């Protein structure tokens, strides 16, 4: 059995020895070499769309794809058929890093670090941001203490993030497809979204990309947020109507936005988001380092050889 692993991941092949597999590295930006098209297992991480499409058409013996991304979109969009090929994701590998980045974006937004940096680059002292400041003033978002944080898309990343937010005094609510209490957090169904948005200081979006979530945050829902509220998106860029977001920012309908993902990446230079004063942009940097990848690959390889159910299978 041949297993292809990507050069985009710093992986010690010795960790996968002992399974009786032939381990071969491959370049995720180039076509799979002809001598490796007989592979039965493909590990995917940061593959180019052309690489995956090529693999989908030429790897006729493929039986299992282990993607290290949190979701399967890239693999499915390339044309791999989940009915004939086992597809597993890297769900859980990015929880801590994305949660950490999200916390950072929230702190930057609340404490106005972005404005301080802007002044620094202009050689100016941002005096209005220092000295005596009102604390927890109604109609503002300047601290996480007692801030009303709504997490839309309450999965594993949210469960990692919530204890950190609560440690800083935030009041956390969740929005998901089904209501309930998860890890001590009250999670509401999307039927309650309108009411929850009206009482939100910062909306954290961790939604997956799909037809059902496209432009989930649209003009109508943006108008429900308080004028001081910030939007933080670390899920998928397609979940926000960027034209509506820009309009809301221009008209002062929301306080600002901290975005790590975008409908088109890289974000085009023509995007007005670059010039918005109260916008913080990061280049899809929240994840990018799948922690525990070797362990997941080894465990699923063991299960695959034993014909057991794979972890994170579609």
What positions do the PLM features span?
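Phosphate-binding beta-alpha-beta segment of Rossmann-like dinucleotide-binding domains, i.e.
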Residues: 85, 90-148
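Short glycine-rich, flexible loops that bind phosphorylated cofactors or substrates
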Residues: 49-52, 73-74, 211-213, 239-240, ...
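Adenosine-phosphate binding glycine-rich loop
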Residues: 268, 276-295, 299-304
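Rossmann-like adenosine-cofactor binding region
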Residues: 173, 178-272
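Hydrophobic Val/Ile/Leu positions in short beta-strands of Rossmann-like dinucleotide-binding domains
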Residues: 5, 149-151
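Hydrophobic/small residue at the entry helix of a nucleotide-binding pocket
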Residues: 157
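An N-terminal-biased, well-structured beta-alpha scaffold segment characteristic
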Residues: 1-88
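Short beta->alpha connector loops at strand-helix junctions that form conserved
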Residues: 68, 86-93, 235, 284
């Amino acid at each position: 059995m041949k297993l292809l692993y990507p050069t985009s991941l710093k992986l010690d092949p010795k960790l996968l020895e002992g399974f009786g597999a032939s381990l071969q590295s491959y370049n995720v930006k180039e076509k799979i070499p002809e001598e490796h098209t007989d592979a039965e297992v493909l590990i995917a991480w940061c593959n180019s769309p052309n690489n995956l499409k090529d693999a989908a058409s030429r790897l006729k013996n493929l039986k299992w794809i282990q993607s290290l991304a949190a979701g399967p979109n890239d693999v499915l969009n390339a044309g791999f058929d989940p009915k004939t090929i086992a597809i597993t994701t890297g769900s859980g590998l990015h929880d801590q890093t994305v949660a950490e980045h999200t916390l950072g974006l929230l702190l930057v937004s609340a404490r106005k670090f972005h404005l301080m940096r802007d002044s620094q680059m202009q050689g100016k002292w941002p005096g209005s941001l220092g000295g005596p400041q009102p604390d927890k003033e109604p109609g503002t978002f300047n601290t996480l203490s007692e801030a009303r944080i709504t997490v839309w898309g309450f999965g594993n990343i949210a469960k990692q993030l919530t204890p950190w937010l609560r440690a800083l005094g935030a009041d956390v609510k969740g929005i998901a497809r089904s209501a309930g209490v998860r890890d001590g957090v009250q999670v509401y169904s999307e039927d309650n979204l309108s009411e929850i948005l009206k009482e939100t200081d910062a909306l954290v979006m961790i939604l997956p990309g799909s037809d059902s979530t496209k432009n989930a945050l649209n003009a109508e829902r943006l108008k429900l947020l308080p004028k001081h509220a910030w939007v933080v998106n670390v899920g998928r860029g397609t979940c926000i109507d960027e034209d509506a977001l820009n309009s809301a920012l221009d008209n002062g309908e929301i306080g600002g936005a901290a975005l790590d993902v975008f409908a088109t990446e890289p974000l085009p230079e023509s995007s007005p988001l670059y010039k918005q004063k109260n916008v913080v942009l990061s280049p899809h940097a929240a994840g990018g380092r799948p922690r525990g990848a070797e362990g997941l690959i080894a465990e699923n390889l063991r299960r695959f050889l034993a014909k057991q159910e794979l972890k994170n299978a579609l």
